[in-house]
Amino acid sequence: MAAIQTKHGFLEYEVMDASSRWKQPSETVLFHHGVGIDMDIWIDWLPYLSTKFRCVRFDMRGCGRSSIPPESDTWSMEEMMSDVLTVADAVDADQFHLIGESIGGTISLYTALNAPDRVTTVTALSTGHRGNYINQVGNWRNTVEQEGFAAWTTKMMEHRFYPGAVADEVYNWFSMTQAKSSPHATLALGELLMAQDLSKDLDKLANPVLLIHPDSSPFLPVSMSAEIHSLLPNSELMVIPHAKHAIACSHAKEASAAFLNFISRCH
């Protein structure tokens, strides 16, 4: 585990590269998690990807082991993109494949739009592009203020997984990690997401994009991912059946295989 300093505090990151040392240097995959969780949501991707790529995971600002900004701090997509590029610079990744889930997917699309020379491909899971079409998130602040953060956590777990979608120990880890997340950072990220509208810019994104979407996210209907797919000039869409929002965790094997297949054909 390592850390890089930014003007908003430090970002914790980790690099795993199990590729053969006698081959060409591995390309870099940079993972960006979503709200209320940390870099370990990607842990089950590593057995599939780390033998082929240098895998870089980090805890998003306000999450996990990274610094939690004060409540007065301003959150913006520009700053979130800056965090991505800061981590990439720290590991000397001039170019990288960017994999993001939920708001991490939205930030990934934004980064590819604004730094296309840095991002080789984007893989976006459970991702929205228009905040006004995202369900549930607009109620987060009321839930936290009126019922408490524990109530928010309980509702979120219902939205993330169908019963039995992950092993009990995975479910418990996810729930405990989410319960320890910063309430004010969580709300700030939700409100940042709700303020976004990338729809007018997506046709300018020439980089290859793979969209992986659950069929039953309580936040984002499949039609939203289909709209993103229709706006992007170079994209593919995969829908995972009988899955709620947290497919980065519940369907790591399937999503990793889809990423590897996508890369083999487009890169």
Model-derived features: positions:
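Conserved acidic catalytic loop of the alpha/beta-hydrolase fold
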Residues: 78-96
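Conserved HGGG/HGGXW glycine-rich cap/lid loop of the alpha/beta-hydrolase fold
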Residues: 9-69
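Conserved alpha/beta-hydrolase "nucleophile elbow" surrounding the catalytic nucleophile
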Residues: 33-35, 96, 100-102
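Catalytic active-site module of serine/aspartate enzymes centered on a nucleophile-bearing elbow/loop
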Residues: 235-267
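Short beta-strand/loop motif that positions the catalytic acidic residue
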Residues: 205, 211-213
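Flexible "cap/lid" loop of the alpha/beta hydrolase fold
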Residues: 106-114, 118-148
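Conserved alpha/beta-hydrolase catalytic His-Asp/Glu region
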Residues: 132-135, 146-203
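Acidic catalytic loop of the alpha/beta-hydrolase fold
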Residues: 216-220
